[in-house]
């Protein structure tokens, strides 16, 4: 591994880059790069990553986080695209999470519900599948 890191003024990681060379055909490994952004309160708001491997293998992801004025996580969305990694072709996958919290006194930081929507497509969007689950907490 040949990782290089960059940091902001409060030591949050801004990027990680693996400068390894792309391996020969049929070999594992490859180059990776990740970037991170933070808001004025140093909370993670987004991340991106890329991977390049042998035999035209590529992958990338994006992550987005949302917060409310009480600093609670309200949303998380991650999207992944990969080509020729698990099979010859393209895979798109991701999820959207929405968090809600209690409203009664003493329960404003208690997680009340997580709604998640998961999806994936292989080759064409017509093969996508949406799953919607509501997880409730007492």
Task: Show the residue positions of the predicted features.
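Acidic/glycine-rich beta-solenoid
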Residues: 1-138
């Amino acid at each position: 591994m040949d990782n290089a890191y960059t940091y902001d003024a409060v030591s949050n990681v801004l990027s990680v880059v693996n400068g390894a060379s792309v391996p020969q055909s049929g070999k594992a490994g490859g180059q990776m790069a990740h970037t991170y952004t933070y808001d004025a309160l140093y909370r993670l708001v987004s991340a991106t990553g890329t991977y390049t491997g042998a035999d035209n293998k590529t992958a990338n992801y994006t992550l987005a986080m949302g917060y409310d004025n009480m600093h609670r996580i309200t949303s998380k969305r991650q999207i992944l695209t990969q080509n020729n990694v698990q099979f010859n072709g393209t895979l798109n996958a991701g999820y959207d999470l929405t968090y809600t919290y209690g409203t009664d006194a003493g329960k404003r930081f208690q997680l009340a519900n997580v709604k998640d929507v998961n999806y994936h497509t292989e080759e064409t969007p017509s093969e996508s599948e949406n799953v919607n689950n509501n997880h409730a907490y007492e």
